Amino acid sequence: MRIALVQSWLGEGAGEPVFPIGLASLAASLPGHEVAAFDPNVAGPVPMAALARFLRDFAPDLTGLSLRNIDSTNTRVNVSYLPPFAATLTTVRRETAGPIAVGGAGFSMFAAALMAAYPAIDFGVALEGEAAFAALAATLASGGDPSATPSLYCRDASGAARFTGEAAKIDLSGLPSPDFSILPMAPYLAVPWGVGVETKRGCALSCVYCPYGFLNGRRYRAKAPAQVAAEINALRDVHGATRFTFLDSVFNCPSDHARAVMEAMVAAGCTLPWSAWFAERGLDRDFLELARRAGCDTVIFSPDAFGDAALKRLGKASSVAEITAAYELVRDLGCFEVSYNFFKNPPGQTLAAALAMLRFIFKARREMGKKAHFELNAIRVEPHTALARLAEEEGLIAPDADLLKPVMYTQKKTAYIEKFLDVLLRAAGK
């Protein structure tokens, strides 16, 4: 089959484009098919016209459309990606005769609602896409019945979408490396954090706001360290990448696999600088020194709160003492930039904890200067999370809310804290 893989347009002014690693992974899992990819986010000033030309020239039998996120999740300047997604879908529908399958993390989290809202979608690929999309392509090529394929949304005779049931999680040891040649790398090199590299899937942590457990499962599934190192060197030597970031939900969990990956990188001569999300608990000097030898120059933490009560309500694995100790390790080594994410008014927030967070931020900026970075955000209520259940219990959302329109959680009794922090952020020009 001729298969087109298309990244959804994010709209005008969406910022630096991110290399579509999902499409690269799909392409690598489609041997025997003629595959071409298109990203309207790097297609110039008239992206839908460029997409239409690509589709007319390639004439696909099947088109896969990736929806990575449905909005920017920023509460003060929230940008919905659904209107540009609709424009992308309309263009694909108009220019192609074959079926359209939509997948990606954004689609998977809101699959039923999106299938209902956009009847132009023929099939939905839920959760991990490599095996399900390849099976869909094979079934369509042979004239079979796609409704027998797991992890698909298929339409019945009335047009209603039916889910075929979740498939078993993919064994990453048998998954080929992403095909990074599916699109030119050059348009993505300006992204500050670089191209994404995956060492594992799954997350055993229990953060109440996070959908990663739903998307990838609670059990870690690891790639071979040597394969990860080979992918990194190929990004540098073949595709011209200048840096990368690890896509793992938390890089150093489990720490033994992360150590093995970094040791393989050192042995393979990986020289690209990189960043990753780290958990504070269990982080030690030896691990960070190995990370530096392997090329890490930026450590990213997401403690989210600075009070033990709020950390417990958020389902975080670390304590304030561990957050402080991890910061001191990074500061004392002196060879990293560090970035932090905090929520302004999470469950369990107190005035004392908010003030302690501000003291921590000012202390870190005083000690590390411009090498310390901070983001203060609201929490978007995502489906399939414990926070969604809490928001329902508190009357913030209805039991049947599809959450396509963003809802931000703020603890009612301390709502003044978020308002105060918003004033500070505006004064700082953020």
Descriptions of predicted regions:
Residues 29-166, 384:
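Glycine-rich beta-alpha loop elements in corrinoid/cobalamin-binding modules
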Residues 173, 178-337, 344-346:
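Radical SAM [4Fe-4S] cluster-binding motif and immediate context
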Residues 111-118, 287, 348-362:
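Catalytic cores of alpha/beta
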Residues 2-13, 156, 189, 337, ...:
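C-terminal accessory regions of radical SAM enzymes
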Residues 1-3, 9-11, 155-196:
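N-terminal [4Fe-4S]-dependent radical SAM core
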Residues 113-132, 293-298, 360-376, 397-403:
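Structural recognition of alpha->loop->beta junctions
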Residues 78-88, 259-260, 316-322, 356-357:
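Charged helix-capping and loop-helix junction motifs
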Residues 12-23:
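Glycine- and acidic-residue-enriched helix-capping/strand-helix junction motifs
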